Amino acid sequence: MSARSTFIGGSLAAVLVLAVAGPAAAHDDHHHHGHDRTAVQQVNLVADLPGVAATTDPELVNPWGLSRGPNTPVWVSDNGTDVTTVYRTDVAGSPVTKALSVAIPGGAPTGQVFHDATDAGNFVVTENGKSGPASFIFDSESGSITAWNPQVDIASAVTVAQGDNAVYKGLALWKTPLGSFLLAADFHNGRIDVFDSEFRRLAMPPTFFNDPKLPAGYAPFNVAVIGDAVYVSYAKQDAEKHDEVDGPGLGFVDVYTDFGQHRERFASRGPLNAPWAITVAPASFGKFAGDILVGDFGDGRINAFDNRGHFEGPLRGSDGKPLAIDGLWGLLPGTAANGGTDNLWFAAGINHEADGLLGLIGPAKS
């Protein structure tokens, strides 16, 4: 399916800015808690290699994005096997069970989001005479946007849009007073692509989601929505502008409000090393509770920042050493139904992305 592009003219752009402008950015709403540092522990649940985790699944290769609904299992983008796999567990320590595997047309999925199917008029998937609102939406390094509805095709997502020479590394669902939009991080072209609720790519003014102060050679690596704010992580491009260059200090994070026009630098260099995952620390994480957590793919560390971007330190194990997960990609808060509210799900492309690991990070057991 060829990309459809709609230009937002000056008057509509102005309306968008006014409609979403408001109080301070959402990251100001996350209050820092001054408790003692909480040590964390990593629990491996699923891996493609036998003996690494309690459950073995050969389809779990280089898992990137994670998503889930309030009561759904966790969905995982398996970049190395061109599928998304779905896993269910509880908080009582029972083994993980695999609920489903869904093919991703175009392959190499990266980011993904959950879409509430009760929002019936938006993000509608149609194929072979069947239609329904997407439950999960994916992007990929092939430049494809795909969406899944179980009544349309339970075994495969459907291609709904295609970016122009795009290499999408991350995806976010952004709900605004003017409707819902998809934000896709195009690492190759160095931009955030915006899609409306009919999967039409919008030709945004160049000032939207743009940081002119970035050094040359950096591009959006991932995008996340927290409250009303949009966080964009940036990594250094390789010569082909397809993959990131890892290294200490190679990374930035910006936070955007006012429909992408107002930008603040949230974090620069320092502990950042190809930052990808962005999420909020659970209340169980001691002094880091409510902080913004940024996961580095480059060194596998998870760094905590307060609501103004002040570096608080890395998550550490009970031995006092920074937790480092080889090939770290996604981080996702657990729920009471799946994983537990005290924990974070993590996904990692271990062994230089040749294999995969899924598990939980939570407070260390004393």
Segment roles from a protein language model:
Residues 24-366:
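Sequence/structural signature of beta-propeller domains
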Residues 1-26:
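Secretory targeting and sorting signals
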